[in-house]
């Protein structure tokens, strides 16, 4: 009886070893976001588009007044998005007649790594109010 139980236990262990296990390779940093276009679509709205990159769970959109050194984080989007329209608000204002520069950074929530981003970004001037 002991031999039978031992044999059954041994077979069970061997069966478990044959079950495929998915192994995830160490994830690399997300790729660099390539900015496609920027356009002031109204006096208080600016649209930015980019190409998706691999290894990304989120895209983080930043803006600054042209010439400024400090990027301001304005929105975090999921990885299904490849564009964002920034609408002026009290927290993230857009002033008529000013130039604004935007950039987008790829981020991976699982690995907590960010991809490289365009430090020069894309710049546009707001359109006059009508």
Range-by-range predicted roles:
Residues 86-115:
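Beta-strand-rich modules
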Residues 33, 48-50, 61, 86, ...:
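An aromatic-rich alpha-helical recognition segment common to small helix-rich domains
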Residues 57, 82, 100, 121:
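Residues that flank catalytic or metal-binding motifs in active/ligand-binding sites
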Residues 54, 65-69, 110-112:
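Solvent-exposed strand-loop boundary residues in beta-sheet-rich modules
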Residues 2-25:
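Sec-dependent N-terminal signal peptides of Gram-positive bacterial secreted proteins and lipoproteins
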Residues 25-55, 96, 112-130:
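Pro/Thr/Ser/Gly-rich low-complexity, intrinsically disordered linker/stalk tracts
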Residues 60-95:
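Recognizes extended acidic, P/S/T-rich segments that occur
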Residues 20, 47-49, 75:
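Residues marking helix boundaries in flexible regions
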